[in-house]
UniProtKB/Swiss-Prot annotation:
Cofactor(s) listed: Mg(2+)
UniProt keyword Translocase, yes or no: no
Annotated ranges, domain Obg: 1-159
Residues holding ATP: 166-173, 191-195, 213-216, 280-283, 309-311
Molecular function terms, GO-annotated: ATP binding; GTP binding; GTPase activity; magnesium ion binding
SUPFAM superfamilies named in the record: Obg GTP-binding protein N-terminal domain (SSF82051), P-loop containing nucleoside triphosphate hydrolases (SSF52540)
CDD domains: Obg
Protein name per its UniProtKB record: GTPase Obg
Transmembrane portions of the chain: none
Gene this chain is encoded by: obg
Oligomeric and partner information: Monomer.
GO-annotated biological processes: ribosome biogenesis
Keyword Hydrolase in record: yes
Top EC group: hydrolase
Length: 327
């Protein structure tokens, strides 16, 4: 399935139905009074969060959604039927903004949470509404009001508690696959992962914790280079970041600094998030070299640095222990 995490759409609520002009025409009521009914309300457009969805793909080619109009009034003071509301399902974690102003209209983070965006127009009045002592046979009516029109931007931000970040080929997909039941595409070349992979990792008490493997970031990501902003936004909601570094990279220290710099440049509090620094592929380097890299990283980050082997499943208990301590 294609991963779409942004969509711009136009929402048009339904127009209210018109009121009508009508008079009672019954056999024994030769001079019947006004009986024109009111129009029905136009349908509104409501966004509803659905935890079964993981992408905004439904809106890729559906850029304009129009709700149903209300029906006109009827004789004998019958009101027209209201237009049916249009329900749009979106993934949990969808933020809704006014496209023109950028103002946040809502943020749907819980399953079945809803937000009415475009409200349907009110129905018009039929001539029965205008009956008075001064006017016993009104011929006035009003048309239904137009429904609201909104142009909005939908932006999906994943609700994972733990985000796994690092340069391409650091081993993020392998790590999430051994920690959870997720089965991401894995290969020995950069940018294998082009969408965030989600996996539930079980705690000792049986409760699940959602991990997200964020696609490989590169230098300049905060400025939109590579996958850039497309995926940096997904770590905004995480509680913890696991910064994975490839031990066999040409310069692991430089790799660490690249990601730290991108977090700092992107802003929005990313650099202040709790981070666990992890050296991966420890089985492929000798112990002396591993100790040297670990010491340098600890001096730079002012944090404890863990060493693991995702493929051999070494050091994972220590990593999870550090994660659970921070959640």
């Amino acid at each position: 399935m294609q991963f779409i995490d942004q969509a711009n759409i136009i929402l048009k609520a339904g127009k209210g139905g018109n009121g009508i002009v009508s008079f009672r025409r019954e056999k024994f009521v030769p001079a019947g009074g006004p009986s024109g009914g009111n129009g029905g309300r136009g349908g509104s457009i409501i966004l509803v969060a659905d935890n079964n969805l993981q992408t905004l793909l439904d809106f890729k080619f559906k850029r304009e959604i129009i709700a149903e109009d209300g029906c006109k009034g009827g004789p004998n003071k019958r009101s027209g039927a209201s237009g049916e509301d249009t329900i749009l399902k979106v993934p949990c974690g969808t933020e809704i903004r006014d496209f023109k102003t950028g103002i946040i209209l809502g943020d749907l983070t819980k399953n079945k949470e809803s937000l009415t965006i475009a409200i349907g127009g009110r129905g018009g009045h039929g001539n029965a509404y205008y009956l008075s002592n001064q006017n016993r046979a009104p011929e006035s009516f009003t048309e239904g009001q137009d429904g609201e029109i909104w142009e909005v931007q939908l932006e999906l931000k994943l609700l994972a508690e733990v985000g796994i970040i690092g340069l391409p080929n650091a081993g993020k997909s392998t790590l999430i696959s051994v920690l959870s039941s997720a089965r991401p595409k894995i290969a020995n070349y950069p940018f294998t992962t082009l969408i965030p992979n989600l996996g539930v990792v079980r705690k000792v008490d049986g409760n699940g914790c959602l991990f997200a493997d964020i696609p490989g970031l590169i230098s300049g990501a905060a400025d939109g280079v590579g996958l850039g902003h497309d995926f940096l936004r997904h770590i905004q909601r995480t509680k913890i970041l696991v910064h994975l570094i490839d031990s066999i990279a040409e310069n692991p220290i430089h790799d660490f600094e690249i990601i730290e710099q991108e977090l700092r440049k992107y802003g929005k509090g990313l650099i202040d998030k709790e981070r666990i620094i992890v050296l991966n592929k420890m089985e492929l380097v000798d112990d002396d070299y591993l100790q040297i890299i670990t010491k340098k990283l600890e001096e730079l980050s002012k944090k404890k640095v863990l060493a693991i082997s995702s493929s051999l499943k070494k050091g994972l208990s220590s990593l999870l222990f550090e994660v659970w301590k921070r959640i």
